[in-house]
Curated annotation (Swiss-Prot):
Top EC group: transferase
Pfam families in alphabetical order: FGGY_C, FGGY_N
Enzyme Commission code(s) on record: 2.7.1.16
Family membership: Belongs to the ribulokinase family.
Pathway(s) of this molecule: Carbohydrate degradation; L-arabinose degradation via L-ribulose; D-xylulose 5-phosphate from L-arabinose (bacterial route): step 2/3
Record-given protein name: Ribulokinase
Catalytic activity: D-ribulose + ATP = D-ribulose 5-phosphate + ADP + H(+); L-ribulose + ATP = L-ribulose 5-phosphate + ADP + H(+)
GO cellular component annotations of the record: cytoplasm
PANTHER family, alphabetized: FGGY CARBOHYDRATE KINASE DOMAIN-CONTAINING PROTEIN, RIBULOKINASE
HAMAP family, A to Z: Ribulokinase
Source organism superkingdom: Bacteria
Amino acid sequence: MSYSIGIDYGTASGRVFLINTTNGQVVSKFVKPYTHGVIESELNGLKIPHTYALQNSNDYLEIMEEGISYIVRESKIDPDNIVGIGIDFTSSTIIFTDENLNPVHNLKQFKNNPHAYVKLWKHHGAYKEAEKLYQTAIENNNKWLGHYGYNVSSEWMIPKIMEVMNRAPEIMEKTAYIMEAGDWIVNKLTNKNVRSNCGLGFKAFWEEETGFHYDLFDKIDPKLSKVIQDKVSAPVVNIGEAVGKLDDKMAQKLGLSKETMVSPFIIDAHASLLGIGSEKDKEMTMVMGTSTCHLMLNEKQHQVPGISGSVKGAIIPELFAYEAGQSAVGDLFEYVAKQAPKSYVDEAENRNMTVFELMNEKIKHQMPGESGLIALDWHNGNRSVLSDSNLTGCIFGLTLQTKHEDIYRAYLEATAFGTKMIMQQYQDWHMEVEKVFACGGIPKKNAVMMDIYANVLNKKLIVMDSEYAPAIGAAILGAVSGGAHNSINDAVDAMKEPILYEINPEAEKVQRYETLFKAYKALHDIHGYKKANIMKDIQSLRVEG
Protein backbone atom coordinates (compact mmCIF):
# COMPACT_ATOMS: atom_id res chain seq x y z
CA MET A 1 0.00 0.00 0.00
CA SER A 2 1.41 3.40 -0.96
CA TYR A 3 0.38 6.96 -0.23
CA SER A 4 1.04 10.43 -1.58
CA ILE A 5 0.85 13.91 -0.11
CA GLY A 6 -0.99 16.78 -1.78
CA ILE A 7 -0.25 20.28 -0.49
CA ASP A 8 -2.77 22.88 -1.62
CA TYR A 9 -1.90 26.55 -1.14
CA GLY A 10 -5.04 28.66 -1.54
CA THR A 11 -5.64 32.38 -1.14
CA ALA A 12 -6.41 32.43 2.58
CA SER A 13 -5.31 29.02 3.86
CA GLY A 14 -3.22 25.95 3.16
CA ARG A 15 -4.15 22.26 3.19
CA VAL A 16 -2.05 19.10 3.47
CA PHE A 17 -3.69 15.80 2.45
CA LEU A 18 -2.48 12.22 2.76
CA ILE A 19 -4.09 10.12 0.00
CA ASN A 20 -4.21 6.39 -0.69
CA THR A 21 -2.77 6.00 -4.20
CA THR A 22 -4.83 2.87 -4.89
CA ASN A 23 -8.33 4.28 -4.39
CA GLY A 24 -8.00 8.02 -3.66
CA GLN A 25 -9.17 7.67 -0.06
CA VAL A 26 -8.33 10.66 2.12
CA VAL A 27 -6.39 9.12 5.00
CA SER A 28 -5.65 12.35 6.86
CA LYS A 29 -5.93 16.08 6.25
CA PHE A 30 -4.67 19.29 7.80
CA VAL A 31 -6.20 22.72 7.13
CA LYS A 32 -4.96 26.01 8.53
CA PRO A 33 -5.45 29.71 7.69
CA TYR A 34 -2.26 31.62 6.95
CA THR A 35 -0.95 33.28 10.10
CA HIS A 36 -0.53 36.65 8.36
CA GLY A 37 -3.50 36.19 6.02
CA VAL A 38 -3.70 38.42 2.96
CA ILE A 39 -1.92 41.76 3.50
CA GLU A 40 -4.20 44.27 1.76
CA SER A 41 -4.67 47.49 3.72
CA GLU A 42 -1.53 47.88 5.81
CA LEU A 43 1.87 46.29 6.30
CA ASN A 44 3.33 46.40 9.81
CA GLY A 45 1.02 49.32 10.60
CA LEU A 46 1.89 51.22 7.42
CA LYS A 47 -0.85 51.93 4.87
CA ILE A 48 -0.42 50.34 1.44
CA PRO A 49 -2.30 51.08 -1.82
CA HIS A 50 -5.75 49.54 -2.26
CA THR A 51 -4.57 47.65 -5.36
CA TYR A 52 -2.04 45.62 -3.35
CA ALA A 53 -2.44 42.02 -2.15
CA LEU A 54 0.63 40.58 -0.44
CA GLN A 55 1.57 37.57 1.67
CA ASN A 56 4.31 36.44 4.03
CA SER A 57 6.12 33.39 2.63
CA ASN A 58 6.91 32.09 6.12
CA ASP A 59 3.24 31.11 6.33
CA TYR A 60 3.76 28.65 3.47
CA LEU A 61 6.58 26.82 5.25
CA GLU A 62 4.48 26.75 8.40
CA ILE A 63 1.65 25.01 6.54
CA MET A 64 4.02 22.49 4.99
CA GLU A 65 5.92 21.63 8.16
CA GLU A 66 2.98 21.57 10.58
CA GLY A 67 0.73 19.84 8.05
CA ILE A 68 3.07 17.00 7.13
CA SER A 69 3.97 16.42 10.77
CA TYR A 70 0.26 16.23 11.65
CA ILE A 71 -0.88 13.86 8.90
CA VAL A 72 2.00 11.43 9.48
CA ARG A 73 1.37 11.42 13.22
CA GLU A 74 -2.42 11.25 12.97
CA SER A 75 -2.51 8.53 10.29
CA LYS A 76 0.22 6.37 11.86
CA ILE A 77 1.35 5.55 8.30
CA ASP A 78 4.94 4.38 7.87
CA PRO A 79 6.72 7.33 6.15
CA ASP A 80 8.52 4.82 3.91
CA ASN A 81 5.15 4.13 2.27
CA ILE A 82 4.69 7.79 1.28
CA VAL A 83 6.07 7.74 -2.25
CA GLY A 84 5.49 11.28 -3.49
CA ILE A 85 4.56 14.88 -2.77
CA GLY A 86 2.60 17.15 -5.12
CA ILE A 87 2.16 20.91 -4.76
CA ASP A 88 -0.54 23.21 -6.09
CA PHE A 89 -0.53 26.96 -5.59
CA THR A 90 -2.47 30.10 -6.46
CA SER A 91 -0.93 31.85 -9.44
CA SER A 92 0.59 34.13 -10.39
CA THR A 93 1.82 34.43 -6.81
CA ILE A 94 5.48 35.38 -7.01
CA ILE A 95 8.36 35.51 -4.58
CA PHE A 96 11.75 37.24 -4.58
CA THR A 97 14.66 35.40 -2.93
CA ASP A 98 18.40 35.59 -2.37
CA GLU A 99 20.84 33.00 -3.72
CA ASN A 100 19.94 30.62 -0.86
CA LEU A 101 16.19 30.76 -1.66
CA ASN A 102 15.57 32.97 1.39
CA PRO A 103 12.78 35.51 0.70
CA VAL A 104 14.08 39.08 0.68
CA HIS A 105 11.20 40.28 2.86
CA ASN A 106 12.96 38.49 5.73
CA LEU A 107 15.88 40.91 5.43
CA LYS A 108 15.71 43.54 8.16
CA GLN A 109 16.11 46.50 5.81
CA PHE A 110 13.09 45.41 3.74
CA LYS A 111 10.72 44.53 6.58
CA ASN A 112 8.41 47.46 5.79
CA ASN A 113 8.84 47.51 2.01
CA PRO A 114 5.74 45.99 0.38
CA HIS A 115 7.65 45.16 -2.81
CA ALA A 116 9.84 42.70 -0.91
CA TYR A 117 6.84 40.54 0.00
CA VAL A 118 5.06 37.82 -1.94
CA LYS A 119 2.81 39.37 -4.58
CA LEU A 120 -0.40 37.35 -4.39
CA TRP A 121 -2.28 36.43 -7.56
CA LYS A 122 -4.86 39.17 -6.96
CA HIS A 123 -2.25 41.90 -6.47
CA HIS A 124 -3.20 44.56 -9.05
CA GLY A 125 -0.44 47.09 -8.33
CA ALA A 126 1.23 46.38 -11.69
CA TYR A 127 -1.64 47.60 -13.86
CA LYS A 128 0.46 50.33 -15.51
CA GLU A 129 3.19 47.83 -16.33
CA ALA A 130 0.61 45.41 -17.75
CA GLU A 131 -0.71 48.15 -20.01
CA LYS A 132 2.80 48.92 -21.26
CA LEU A 133 3.44 45.24 -21.99
CA TYR A 134 0.18 44.98 -23.90
CA GLN A 135 0.69 48.14 -25.95
CA THR A 136 4.25 47.14 -26.86
CA ALA A 137 3.12 43.67 -27.93
CA ILE A 138 0.33 45.13 -30.08
CA GLU A 139 2.60 47.73 -31.68
CA ASN A 140 5.08 45.01 -32.61
CA ASN A 141 2.42 42.64 -33.91
CA ASN A 142 3.39 39.82 -31.56
CA LYS A 143 1.14 37.07 -32.91
CA TRP A 144 1.80 34.79 -29.95
CA LEU A 145 -0.21 37.22 -27.80
CA GLY A 146 -3.24 35.31 -29.07
CA HIS A 147 -2.13 32.38 -26.91
CA TYR A 148 -2.88 34.64 -23.93
CA GLY A 149 -6.26 35.88 -25.10
CA TYR A 150 -4.77 38.99 -26.77
CA ASN A 151 -4.38 40.55 -23.35
CA VAL A 152 -1.91 41.12 -20.55
CA SER A 153 -3.09 40.93 -16.94
CA SER A 154 -1.59 42.80 -14.01
CA GLU A 155 -2.00 39.51 -12.13
CA TRP A 156 0.74 37.82 -14.21
CA MET A 157 4.42 37.46 -13.39
CA ILE A 158 6.14 39.81 -15.86
CA PRO A 159 4.12 42.96 -14.98
CA LYS A 160 4.80 42.28 -11.30
CA ILE A 161 8.53 41.99 -11.98
CA MET A 162 8.42 45.27 -13.92
CA GLU A 163 6.60 46.86 -10.99
CA VAL A 164 9.47 46.01 -8.64
CA MET A 165 12.07 47.12 -11.19
CA ASN A 166 10.33 50.49 -11.54
CA ARG A 167 9.35 51.18 -7.95
CA ALA A 168 11.83 49.30 -5.78
CA PRO A 169 15.12 48.77 -7.65
CA GLU A 170 16.84 48.19 -4.32
CA ILE A 171 14.75 45.02 -3.93
CA MET A 172 15.70 43.81 -7.39
CA GLU A 173 19.37 44.43 -6.65
CA LYS A 174 19.22 42.07 -3.65
CA THR A 175 17.16 39.45 -5.51
CA ALA A 176 18.92 36.41 -6.96
CA TYR A 177 15.82 34.45 -8.02
CA ILE A 178 12.23 35.27 -8.91
CA MET A 179 9.72 32.45 -9.14
CA GLU A 180 6.17 31.34 -8.58
CA ALA A 181 5.61 30.56 -4.90
CA GLY A 182 4.74 27.02 -5.97
CA ASP A 183 8.17 26.64 -7.56
CA TRP A 184 9.73 28.02 -4.38
CA ILE A 185 8.12 25.31 -2.24
CA VAL A 186 9.27 22.61 -4.67
CA ASN A 187 12.80 24.03 -4.65
CA LYS A 188 12.84 24.20 -0.85
CA LEU A 189 11.80 20.54 -0.72
CA THR A 190 14.41 19.35 -3.22
CA ASN A 191 17.18 21.95 -2.79
CA LYS A 192 17.05 22.64 -6.54
CA ASN A 193 16.30 25.63 -8.73
CA VAL A 194 13.73 24.53 -11.32
CA ARG A 195 10.51 25.86 -12.80
CA SER A 196 7.20 24.20 -13.68
CA ASN A 197 6.00 24.40 -17.28
CA CYS A 198 2.51 25.12 -15.93
CA GLY A 199 3.47 28.28 -14.04
CA LEU A 200 5.88 29.63 -16.66
CA GLY A 201 3.57 28.85 -19.55
CA PHE A 202 0.49 30.51 -18.16
CA LYS A 203 1.99 33.45 -16.29
CA ALA A 204 5.39 34.38 -17.75
CA PHE A 205 5.12 34.46 -21.58
CA TRP A 206 7.11 31.24 -21.90
CA GLU A 207 6.42 28.61 -24.55
CA GLU A 208 7.90 25.14 -24.94
CA GLU A 209 9.13 25.69 -28.48
CA THR A 210 10.47 29.24 -28.16
CA GLY A 211 11.14 29.82 -24.46
CA PHE A 212 10.71 33.38 -23.15
CA HIS A 213 9.74 36.14 -25.57
CA TYR A 214 12.90 38.21 -25.15
CA ASP A 215 12.13 40.16 -28.32
CA LEU A 216 9.22 41.80 -26.52
CA PHE A 217 11.15 42.28 -23.27
CA ASP A 218 14.02 44.00 -25.13
CA LYS A 219 11.66 46.52 -26.70
CA ILE A 220 10.26 47.42 -23.28
CA ASP A 221 13.59 47.58 -21.47
CA PRO A 222 16.79 45.59 -22.13
CA LYS A 223 17.18 45.37 -18.34
CA LEU A 224 13.94 43.37 -18.23
CA SER A 225 15.39 40.70 -20.52
CA LYS A 226 18.46 40.43 -18.30
CA VAL A 227 16.32 40.10 -15.16
CA ILE A 228 14.28 37.31 -16.76
CA GLN A 229 17.40 35.56 -18.03
CA ASP A 230 19.35 35.84 -14.76
CA LYS A 231 16.64 35.54 -12.12
CA VAL A 232 13.64 33.74 -13.64
CA SER A 233 15.04 31.33 -16.23
CA ALA A 234 15.91 27.86 -14.90
CA PRO A 235 15.56 24.21 -15.97
CA VAL A 236 11.89 23.44 -16.72
CA VAL A 237 10.13 20.32 -15.45
CA ASN A 238 6.86 19.29 -17.11
CA ILE A 239 3.68 18.24 -15.35
CA GLY A 240 3.73 14.44 -15.10
CA GLU A 241 7.48 14.31 -14.54
CA ALA A 242 9.42 14.29 -11.26
CA VAL A 243 11.67 17.08 -10.00
CA GLY A 244 13.60 14.65 -7.82
CA LYS A 245 13.90 13.26 -4.32
CA LEU A 246 13.44 15.16 -1.08
CA ASP A 247 16.57 16.91 0.07
CA ASP A 248 18.13 14.87 2.91
CA LYS A 249 17.87 17.69 5.46
CA MET A 250 14.29 18.43 4.47
CA ALA A 251 13.35 14.74 4.69
CA GLN A 252 14.76 14.60 8.20
CA LYS A 253 12.99 17.81 9.20
CA LEU A 254 9.62 16.60 7.87
CA GLY A 255 9.97 13.04 9.15
CA LEU A 256 9.72 11.54 5.66
CA SER A 257 11.85 9.11 3.69
CA LYS A 258 14.62 10.70 1.64
CA GLU A 259 13.39 8.48 -1.22
CA THR A 260 10.12 10.45 -1.39
CA MET A 261 9.75 12.02 -4.85
CA VAL A 262 8.51 15.55 -5.53
CA SER A 263 6.51 16.63 -8.58
CA PRO A 264 6.63 20.10 -10.19
CA PHE A 265 4.02 22.52 -8.89
CA ILE A 266 0.74 22.95 -10.73
CA ILE A 267 -1.59 25.96 -10.57
CA ASP A 268 -4.29 25.26 -7.97
CA ALA A 269 -7.30 25.47 -10.27
CA HIS A 270 -5.57 23.28 -12.84
CA ALA A 271 -4.94 20.60 -10.23
CA SER A 272 -8.71 20.43 -9.74
CA LEU A 273 -9.22 18.95 -13.20
CA LEU A 274 -7.11 16.01 -12.14
CA GLY A 275 -8.88 15.78 -8.79
CA ILE A 276 -12.33 15.50 -10.36
CA GLY A 277 -11.29 13.38 -13.34
CA SER A 278 -11.81 15.80 -16.23
CA GLU A 279 -9.27 14.56 -18.80
CA LYS A 280 -11.01 15.21 -22.15
CA ASP A 281 -12.03 18.00 -24.47
CA LYS A 282 -15.61 19.36 -24.60
CA GLU A 283 -15.68 19.51 -20.78
CA MET A 284 -15.59 22.88 -18.99
CA THR A 285 -14.64 22.76 -15.33
CA MET A 286 -15.47 25.58 -12.93
CA VAL A 287 -13.13 25.65 -9.95
CA MET A 288 -15.05 27.84 -7.54
CA GLY A 289 -13.56 29.55 -4.51
CA THR A 290 -12.63 33.15 -3.78
CA SER A 291 -12.46 33.42 -7.57
CA THR A 292 -13.51 31.01 -10.32
CA CYS A 293 -11.31 29.47 -13.00
CA HIS A 294 -12.93 28.02 -16.12
CA LEU A 295 -10.72 25.34 -17.59
CA MET A 296 -10.83 23.27 -20.75
CA LEU A 297 -8.59 20.81 -22.59
CA ASN A 298 -8.16 20.54 -26.35
CA GLU A 299 -5.88 18.82 -28.86
CA LYS A 300 -5.29 22.08 -30.72
CA GLN A 301 -4.14 25.54 -29.71
CA HIS A 302 -6.83 28.06 -30.58
CA GLN A 303 -6.30 31.79 -30.13
CA VAL A 304 -9.32 32.67 -27.98
CA PRO A 305 -9.69 36.40 -27.19
CA GLY A 306 -10.19 37.26 -23.54
CA ILE A 307 -8.95 34.04 -21.96
CA SER A 308 -5.94 33.88 -19.64
CA GLY A 309 -3.81 31.50 -21.66
CA SER A 310 -3.32 28.16 -23.39
CA VAL A 311 -0.34 25.93 -22.64
CA LYS A 312 0.57 22.49 -23.99
CA GLY A 313 0.99 19.79 -21.36
CA ALA A 314 0.23 22.04 -18.40
CA ILE A 315 -2.37 19.59 -17.02
CA ILE A 316 -2.43 16.50 -19.26
CA PRO A 317 0.58 15.70 -21.49
CA GLU A 318 0.02 16.47 -25.19
CA LEU A 319 -3.25 18.36 -24.59
CA PHE A 320 -3.48 22.14 -24.53
CA ALA A 321 -4.87 23.48 -21.28
CA TYR A 322 -7.02 26.62 -21.47
CA GLU A 323 -7.79 28.97 -18.59
CA ALA A 324 -10.28 31.79 -18.21
CA GLY A 325 -11.73 33.18 -15.03
CA GLN A 326 -13.63 35.57 -12.80
CA SER A 327 -11.71 37.55 -10.19
CA ALA A 328 -14.40 37.75 -7.50
CA VAL A 329 -16.88 34.98 -6.71
CA GLY A 330 -16.61 33.66 -3.15
CA ASP A 331 -15.06 37.00 -2.17
CA LEU A 332 -18.08 38.77 -3.66
CA PHE A 333 -20.60 36.64 -1.78
CA GLU A 334 -18.65 37.15 1.45
CA TYR A 335 -18.80 40.89 0.82
CA VAL A 336 -22.60 40.74 0.45
CA ALA A 337 -22.97 38.62 3.61
CA LYS A 338 -20.96 41.15 5.60
CA GLN A 339 -23.37 43.90 4.48
CA ALA A 340 -26.41 42.00 5.79
CA PRO A 341 -28.73 44.01 8.09
CA LYS A 342 -28.48 43.28 11.79
CA SER A 343 -31.96 41.76 11.73
CA TYR A 344 -30.72 39.12 9.26
CA VAL A 345 -27.63 38.39 11.33
CA ASP A 346 -29.74 38.03 14.46
CA GLU A 347 -32.29 35.79 12.73
CA ALA A 348 -29.55 33.54 11.38
CA GLU A 349 -27.96 33.30 14.81
CA ASN A 350 -31.28 32.55 16.53
CA ARG A 351 -32.01 29.80 14.00
CA ASN A 352 -28.50 28.35 14.27
CA MET A 353 -27.70 28.94 10.60
CA THR A 354 -25.33 31.09 8.57
CA VAL A 355 -26.33 34.32 6.86
CA PHE A 356 -25.74 32.52 3.54
CA GLU A 357 -28.16 29.75 4.50
CA LEU A 358 -30.76 32.32 5.55
CA MET A 359 -30.48 34.27 2.29
CA ASN A 360 -30.60 31.07 0.23
CA GLU A 361 -33.80 30.13 2.04
CA LYS A 362 -35.31 33.53 1.21
CA ILE A 363 -34.48 33.36 -2.52
CA LYS A 364 -34.84 29.68 -3.38
CA HIS A 365 -38.46 30.01 -4.54
CA GLN A 366 -37.93 33.23 -6.52
CA MET A 367 -38.23 33.04 -10.29
CA PRO A 368 -35.53 34.61 -12.48
CA GLY A 369 -36.13 38.34 -12.84
CA GLU A 370 -38.52 38.54 -9.90
CA SER A 371 -36.38 41.06 -8.00
CA GLY A 372 -35.93 43.39 -10.98
CA LEU A 373 -32.18 43.57 -10.35
CA ILE A 374 -29.15 42.86 -12.48
CA ALA A 375 -25.50 43.31 -11.51
CA LEU A 376 -22.00 43.40 -12.95
CA ASP A 377 -19.71 41.22 -10.83
CA TRP A 378 -16.52 43.21 -11.33
CA HIS A 379 -15.71 44.05 -7.71
CA ASN A 380 -12.17 42.76 -8.24
CA GLY A 381 -11.97 43.70 -11.91
CA ASN A 382 -12.85 41.51 -14.88
CA ARG A 383 -10.42 38.74 -15.80
CA SER A 384 -12.33 37.20 -18.71
CA VAL A 385 -13.34 38.17 -21.27
CA LEU A 386 -12.51 41.85 -20.78
CA SER A 387 -9.15 41.35 -19.04
CA ASP A 388 -9.37 44.67 -17.22
CA SER A 389 -8.53 44.73 -13.51
CA ASN A 390 -9.53 48.41 -13.25
CA LEU A 391 -13.23 47.80 -13.85
CA THR A 392 -15.56 47.90 -10.85
CA GLY A 393 -18.93 46.40 -9.96
CA CYS A 394 -22.38 47.86 -10.52
CA ILE A 395 -25.95 46.95 -9.60
CA PHE A 396 -29.00 48.12 -11.55
CA GLY A 397 -32.70 48.21 -10.73
CA LEU A 398 -32.58 49.21 -7.06
CA THR A 399 -35.77 50.60 -5.54
CA LEU A 400 -36.90 51.46 -2.02
CA GLN A 401 -38.49 48.00 -1.93
CA THR A 402 -35.27 46.10 -2.72
CA LYS A 403 -34.35 43.58 -0.02
CA HIS A 404 -30.89 42.39 0.90
CA GLU A 405 -31.54 38.88 -0.38
CA ASP A 406 -32.49 40.38 -3.76
CA ILE A 407 -29.04 41.94 -3.98
CA TYR A 408 -27.48 38.63 -2.97
CA ARG A 409 -29.37 36.79 -5.71
CA ALA A 410 -28.42 39.44 -8.27
CA TYR A 411 -24.76 38.78 -7.50
CA LEU A 412 -25.21 35.00 -7.73
CA GLU A 413 -26.80 35.51 -11.14
CA ALA A 414 -24.11 37.99 -12.20
CA THR A 415 -21.37 35.43 -11.62
CA ALA A 416 -23.40 32.90 -13.61
CA PHE A 417 -23.82 35.38 -16.47
CA GLY A 418 -20.07 36.07 -16.37
CA THR A 419 -19.46 32.34 -16.67
CA LYS A 420 -21.84 32.19 -19.65
CA MET A 421 -19.83 34.95 -21.35
CA ILE A 422 -16.73 32.78 -20.94
CA MET A 423 -18.45 29.59 -22.11
CA GLN A 424 -19.78 31.34 -25.21
CA GLN A 425 -16.31 32.70 -25.94
CA TYR A 426 -14.85 29.20 -25.89
CA GLN A 427 -17.65 27.96 -28.17
CA ASP A 428 -17.30 30.89 -30.57
CA TRP A 429 -13.65 29.91 -31.07
CA HIS A 430 -14.19 26.25 -31.97
CA MET A 431 -14.24 24.69 -28.49
CA GLU A 432 -17.57 22.96 -27.96
CA VAL A 433 -18.87 22.59 -24.39
CA GLU A 434 -20.93 19.46 -23.75
CA LYS A 435 -20.41 18.98 -20.01
CA VAL A 436 -19.94 21.47 -17.17
CA PHE A 437 -18.32 20.39 -13.90
CA ALA A 438 -18.36 22.43 -10.69
CA CYS A 439 -15.99 21.78 -7.81
CA GLY A 440 -14.90 23.51 -4.63
CA GLY A 441 -16.51 24.37 -1.34
CA ILE A 442 -19.12 26.73 -2.80
CA PRO A 443 -20.83 24.25 -5.20
CA LYS A 444 -20.96 21.59 -2.51
CA LYS A 445 -22.61 23.93 0.00
CA ASN A 446 -24.86 26.05 -2.21
CA ALA A 447 -27.43 24.09 -4.24
CA VAL A 448 -29.46 27.27 -4.89
CA MET A 449 -26.50 28.80 -6.67
CA MET A 450 -25.90 25.64 -8.70
CA ASP A 451 -29.54 25.65 -9.83
CA ILE A 452 -29.06 29.23 -11.06
CA TYR A 453 -25.91 28.24 -12.96
CA ALA A 454 -27.54 25.22 -14.64
CA ASN A 455 -30.38 27.36 -15.94
CA VAL A 456 -28.25 30.34 -16.97
CA LEU A 457 -25.81 28.09 -18.86
CA ASN A 458 -28.59 25.79 -20.12
CA LYS A 459 -26.31 22.81 -19.45
CA LYS A 460 -26.46 19.81 -17.18
CA LEU A 461 -24.27 20.72 -14.23
CA ILE A 462 -22.19 18.01 -12.55
CA VAL A 463 -21.31 18.95 -8.97
CA MET A 464 -18.37 17.08 -7.50
CA ASP A 465 -18.20 15.75 -3.95
CA SER A 466 -15.07 17.63 -3.05
CA GLU A 467 -14.14 20.86 -1.35
CA TYR A 468 -10.49 19.99 -1.87
CA ALA A 469 -10.11 18.91 -5.50
CA PRO A 470 -6.81 20.83 -5.89
CA ALA A 471 -5.23 18.88 -3.03
CA ILE A 472 -6.39 15.60 -4.59
CA GLY A 473 -4.98 16.69 -7.94
CA ALA A 474 -1.65 17.60 -6.34
CA ALA A 475 -1.55 14.20 -4.61
CA ILE A 476 -2.22 12.53 -7.98
CA LEU A 477 0.89 14.20 -9.40
CA GLY A 478 2.81 13.16 -6.29
CA ALA A 479 1.69 9.56 -6.86
CA VAL A 480 2.86 9.67 -10.49
CA SER A 481 6.24 11.16 -9.56
CA GLY A 482 6.64 8.46 -6.89
CA GLY A 483 5.92 5.63 -9.32
CA ALA A 484 2.60 4.52 -7.83
CA HIS A 485 1.02 4.93 -11.29
CA ASN A 486 2.53 4.83 -14.77
CA SER A 487 0.72 7.90 -16.08
CA ILE A 488 -1.43 10.83 -15.01
CA ASN A 489 -4.45 9.22 -16.68
CA ASP A 490 -3.99 5.99 -14.71
CA ALA A 491 -3.63 7.94 -11.47
CA VAL A 492 -6.71 10.05 -12.20
CA ASP A 493 -8.82 6.96 -12.90
CA ALA A 494 -7.80 5.45 -9.56
CA MET A 495 -7.82 8.53 -7.32
CA LYS A 496 -10.41 11.02 -8.64
CA GLU A 497 -13.25 12.37 -6.50
CA PRO A 498 -16.87 11.12 -6.87
CA ILE A 499 -19.89 13.01 -8.21
CA LEU A 500 -22.13 14.57 -5.53
CA TYR A 501 -25.18 15.37 -7.67
CA GLU A 502 -26.29 16.59 -11.10
CA ILE A 503 -28.73 19.38 -12.00
CA ASN A 504 -30.62 19.63 -15.28
CA PRO A 505 -31.87 22.99 -16.61
CA GLU A 506 -35.61 23.78 -16.53
CA ALA A 507 -37.15 25.19 -19.70
CA GLU A 508 -39.12 28.05 -18.09
CA LYS A 509 -36.16 29.27 -16.06
CA VAL A 510 -33.84 28.97 -19.06
CA GLN A 511 -36.15 31.16 -21.13
CA ARG A 512 -36.39 33.84 -18.42
CA TYR A 513 -32.62 33.83 -17.97
CA GLU A 514 -32.10 34.28 -21.71
CA THR A 515 -33.96 37.59 -21.40
CA LEU A 516 -31.92 38.62 -18.37
CA PHE A 517 -28.68 37.59 -20.05
CA LYS A 518 -29.38 39.91 -22.99
CA ALA A 519 -29.64 42.77 -20.48
CA TYR A 520 -26.46 41.63 -18.72
CA LYS A 521 -24.56 41.45 -22.02
CA ALA A 522 -25.74 44.93 -23.01
CA LEU A 523 -24.53 46.36 -19.69
CA HIS A 524 -21.33 44.31 -19.95
CA ASP A 525 -20.54 45.78 -23.37
CA ILE A 526 -21.45 49.35 -22.41
CA HIS A 527 -19.42 49.46 -19.18
CA GLY A 528 -16.70 47.08 -20.32
CA TYR A 529 -16.08 48.45 -23.83
CA LYS A 530 -18.02 51.50 -24.95
CA LYS A 531 -18.10 53.51 -21.71
CA ALA A 532 -15.44 51.80 -19.61
CA ASN A 533 -13.96 55.21 -18.79
CA ILE A 534 -16.94 56.00 -16.51
CA MET A 535 -15.86 53.52 -13.85
CA LYS A 536 -12.20 54.39 -14.26
CA ASP A 537 -12.82 58.14 -13.96
CA ILE A 538 -14.60 57.53 -10.66
CA GLN A 539 -11.78 55.30 -9.42
CA SER A 540 -9.20 57.94 -10.35
CA LEU A 541 -10.64 60.16 -7.63
CA ARG A 542 -9.50 57.70 -4.96
CA VAL A 543 -6.39 58.73 -3.05
CA GLU A 544 -3.50 56.36 -3.65
CA GLY A 545 -1.46 55.35 -0.61
